[in-house]
């Protein structure tokens, strides 16, 4: 059923509505206010956000990839997310802090040459299990 809803959403131009046209040429081009009102209605259904490819955490992750991702990251991760073929995750649950607040993360990052070294620990991953 969800695949049929996704097909219909694409036909109606209701796909990836949260992204600006600068990041996604097929975007309906809603303002943040307009999309906020739409998101309020989508939130009344357990499946609506996924049916129009506007479900968290994918929306935020797609925005980050669209704005900051390099070409290889966009090809490997952004395009499949935009197409609705994969789901993503945002992991922030750490064992020593109440990390439902993304600003409370203990993870550290340092630059070494052209690379960034991440040092941290995620205690569990419950995102995306059983979605399909």
What residue spans do the PLM features occupy?
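Intrinsic structural disorder
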Residues: 1, 21, 92-94
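Internal helix-loop-helix
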Residues: 3-75, 79-84, 125-130
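Glycine-rich, Trp-frequent "lid" loop and neighboring beta-strands that shape
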Residues: 28, 68-132
């Amino acid at each position: 059923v969800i695949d049929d809803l996704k097909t219909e959403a694409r036909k109606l131009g209701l796909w990836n509505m949260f992204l600006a046209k600068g990041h996604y040429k097929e975007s309906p081009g809603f303002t943040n206010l307009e999309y906020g009102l739409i998101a309020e209605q989508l939130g009344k259904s357990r499946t609506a956000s996924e049916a129009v490819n506007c479900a968290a955490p994918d929306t935020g992750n797609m925005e980050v990839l669209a704005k900051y991702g390099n070409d290889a990251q966009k090809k490997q991760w952004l395009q499949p997310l935009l197409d609705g073929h994969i789901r993503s995750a945002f992991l922030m649950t750490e064992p020593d802090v109440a990390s439902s607040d993304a600003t409370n993360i203990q993870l550290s990052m340092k630059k070494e040459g052209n690379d960034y070294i991440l040092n941290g620990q995620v205690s569990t991953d419950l995102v995306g299990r059983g979605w399909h």
